[in-house]
């Protein structure tokens, strides 16, 4: 039997059975879930109603993540799935779905921050910079350019919880796209109250 999105197979509110009024129709069809896993990218194309195409992601390992407070978006590697409000099984099997909480690589965001503000981020005190990083941060600049960066640095504050994550090189993010429909796992970096909430949830889950 095919997956059907009809409602006449359900019982009445009184508990009585309904007689089937017709056979299944094409416009009532449903498809099996994509259950997108972490791994080298694999996307299938699915023809849908009206000749449109859906991008069924079966495996993904990267996504575009937005750092809201800095208005910056970077492509980053997805490392792990750590929390899912709807189902713990989806965490165990590392399934990427909308609103899954994932761990992403912090490097692209750190590189952007350091080149934008010319300030180190998420580094131990006294840690040596590589030649390339040193060339970006300590490069000799004109007076006008230096003034521009000084003005930026006044607004360069990063909240402590996020800075701690930069020290570990991993950031918590939330998937905002639907990988089984659009073939992408894009989302945003968790900040503020939302970050606090999910850190609490993850901590209590580990304590069990």
Swiss-Prot record:
InterPro entries: Ribosomal_eS8 (IPR001047), Ribosomal_eS8_CS (IPR018283), Ribosomal_protein_eS8_euk (IPR042563), Ribosomal_Se8/biogenesis_NSA2 (IPR022309)
Main location: cytoplasm
Keywords: Cytoplasm, Lipoprotein, Membrane, Nucleus, Ribonucleoprotein, Ribosomal protein
PROSITE patterns found in the cross-reference section: RIBOSOMAL_S8E
Region (Disordered): 1-34
Any one Gene Ontology cellular component term annotated for this protein: ribosome
Keyword hit for Nucleotide-binding: no
Gene3D superfamilies to which the protein is assigned, alphabetical: 3.10.290.70, Ribosomal protein S8e, subdomain
Transmembrane regions: none
Location in the cell: Cytoplasm; Membrane; Nucleus, Nucleolus
Basic residues composition-biased segments: 7-26
Record text on subunit structure and interactions: Component of the small ribosomal subunit. Identified in a IGF2BP1-dependent mRNP granule complex containing untranslated mRNAs. Part of the small subunit (SSU) processome, composed of more than 70 proteins and the RNA chaperone small nucleolar RNA (snoRNA) U3.
Protein's name according to its UniProt entry: Small ribosomal subunit protein eS8
Organism: Spodoptera frugiperda
């Amino acid at each position: 039997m095919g997956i059907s999105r009809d409602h006449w197979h359900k019982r009445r509110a009184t508990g009585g059975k309904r007689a089937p009024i017709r056979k299944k129709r094409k416009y009532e069809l449903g498809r099996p879930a994509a259950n997108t896993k972490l791994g080298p990218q694999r996307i299938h194309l699915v023809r849908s109603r009206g000749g449109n195409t859906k991008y069924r992601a079966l495996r993904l390992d990267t996504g575009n993540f937005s750092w809201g407070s800095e208005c910056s978006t970077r492509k980053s590697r997805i490392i792990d799935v750590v929390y899912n409000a709807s189902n713990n099984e989806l965490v165990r099997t590392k399934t990427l779905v909308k609103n899954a909480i994932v761990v992403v690589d912090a490097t692209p965001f750190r590189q952007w921050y350091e080149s934008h503000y010319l300030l180190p981020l998420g580094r131990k005190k006294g840690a040596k910079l590589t030649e390339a990083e040193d060339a970006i941060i300590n490069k000799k600049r004109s007076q006008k350019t230096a003034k521009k960066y000084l003005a930026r640095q006044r607004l360069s504050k990063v909240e402590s919880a996020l800075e701690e994550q930069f020290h570990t090189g991993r950031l918590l993010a939330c998937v905002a796209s639907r990988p089984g429909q659009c073939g992408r796992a894009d989302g945003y970096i968790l900040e503020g109250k939302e970050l606090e909430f999910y850190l609490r949830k993850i901590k209590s889950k580990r304590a069990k």
